[in-house]
Structure formats: structure tokens, C-alpha cells
Amino acid sequence: TPLEKLVQRKISRYFFEQRKRQLRKLEEGLGKTVTRELAVETMLLDLEEENILLKKVVWPLYLEIGQEAGKSLLVELGADPEIFTLVDTPAIAALEDKLIKVVGINETVREQLRDTLIEGMGQMETTAELMERVKQVYNFAQSRSLTIARTETGQAAGLARDAAMGQMQVVKHRWVTAGDEHVRVSHQELNGMVVERGQLFPNGCRFPCDPGGPAGEVINCRCVAAPL
């Protein structure tokens, strides 16, 4: 979807800029007379600062995705999409909770950087070799940008659609898959299943892409809940 592609571009750009910051800090820190493990810690980017930057990137995206998804749901119901608002809905609180958890992306990258740099310094690698290790970590992070974008977009949209259903007093909804060969087996089995809104589907999700659902049922999900 266009919004998914927008999120992917933003996340990919964030990783690109973060890589530049990390390479610069690594280059500046190499050569200091400290223990190897301590040297690595001092040459990694400040996690708190990076988390602030990441949140600034994703929060406007969450709001845009949520607003568009909520309006789309109202159109499906034949209602005026302009009456939808995220303000004072459970979706806003849930999106704020997502904002707290999204920093896990940075924590994963930082741990990978720490491990690979300790290994490289233990092998007395050159500056060029250590910097290549950093690039490899970010190459992997970049390769995950579509998965991250799809998951973040789906979760923000799922929350907003659920909020819109609440606004329109929808009682039941149906699980609808993307209908192609990439749909996971557990979701193929759920396709067409109807439950009361707020109750769990058999896979532990309140709705497709539910941030509170099991990770294995949410990551890369493209399903939606259709109101009845």
C-alpha cells in the first residue's frame, strides 16, 4: 500500500542516517587506550538519543495511518469519513504504547553492533574491517525495513479500524485475509470467521495486526477486520 511504502522509506532512511552517525562515532573512538569491551560501549550511539529520533520519525506516521484507516472503515460502512477522529479513542493510547515499544528496533541493532564489534576487536581487526562489520549490521537492518513497515502499518491501521468500529457501534467483525499464497496457514483458517468485537479470535488476536497479539500472528500480517 502507499502508506506501507511511505513507512518503509522513512524507516530505511532512518537506518541510513543512523549508520552514518554510528560509523562517525566508531571512527572517532578507535585508538583510545581502554579495555576492548569498554571501548565498544563508548563507541556505540547513545540509545536514549536514538530512541527519541526514532519516535519523531514514526509518531506522525502512526497518526497519518490511523486517520486514513479510520476514514476508510467509515466509507465501508457508508458513513461520512470526516466524522472519524482518533482523539479520545482507545486507539490513541494504544498507539502511544506502540511508540514506547518501537524502540525495540534500536535495541536489537545496538546489541548486534556490540556483539560484532567486540568480536572484531578481539581479533585485532583494522578500522576498515570494524567499519565493515557496522555496515553489515545496517545492511541487515535495511533488509528488514519492509517487514518492519508492514508490521507497523498494519498495527496502526488495525487499531484505528477498531476505534472506528467502536465509534460506529459495530458489534461483530470478520477476519479477511489478503487472499494470496503468502497468507500464513493460521490466518487462512481464520478467513471469514466472525466474532464479537473485543473478543479474541482463536489465534489470540482481537483483530488482525493486533499489537497485543502473539508476535508470530502479527509480524508481516496483511489481514483486516471487516465490520458486520
Predicted features by range, described:
Residues 140, 144-228:
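Acidic, glycine-rich two-metal-ion catalytic cores of nucleic acid-processing enzymes
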Residues 1-139, 228:
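N-terminal leader/targeting and assembly helices and adjacent pre-domain segments
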